[in-house]
A protein has these predicted regions:
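Structural signature for solvent-exposed beta-strand/loop edge elements and short helix-capping sites
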Residues: 1-149
Length: 149
């Protein structure tokens, strides 16, 4: 499919300048300005290339990859070279970010090489030279673990 195509799957829509989609296998690839939106969980995954498997609910984005989560009256912006998003069950998901990770929302910002976040336990792991800023504080170390209630 060409010319800014869209593929709908339940609460999710895969958008791209061109899309290769196999309905029988339940997966698609998007090339150029890829966006995977999940309206139920209020998240968006973007990049210049992306892959989505609707059966396993696994998504991958690379080349200017960005993840946005609209929750708690604020938006979390996450940027990295490569992002993976996978559903653990109907309410929990895991996000992994690799290479040149940067994230921010109004109450905190951070940078690191790689990061992992699981919505089930709300623990954020920052790896390899992480730095976290919160108001006037700066935290750094070789690994940072954040418990986010």
């Amino acid at each position: 499919m060409l010319d800014r195509s869209e593929v709908y799957s339940g609460n999710r829509v895969l958008i791209g300048d061109s899309i290769s989609y196999d309905q029988n296998a339940g997966f698609g690839e998007a090339f150029g300005n890829m966006c995977l939106q999940d309206t139920a969980q209020k998240v968006m995954l973007e990049g210049q290339y992306g892959f989505y498997n609707e059966r396993t609910e696994y998504a991958f984005a690379t080349d200017s990859a960005r993840f946005l989560e609209y929750s708690q009256g604020d938006t979390l912006y996450l940027h990295a070279d490569t992002l993976e998003m996978m559903s653990i069950d109907s309410t929990a998901r895991e996000i992994k970010a690799f290479y040149g990770v940067r994230f921010y929302r109004t109450d905190m910002q951070g940078v690191c090489d790689s990061m992992q976040f699981n919505t089930r336990d709300s623990i954020l792991y920052m790896y390899r030279d992480p730095i976290l800023w919160n108001e006037q504080y700066q935290i750094s170390g070789d690994t940072i673990v954040i418990y986010m209630n």
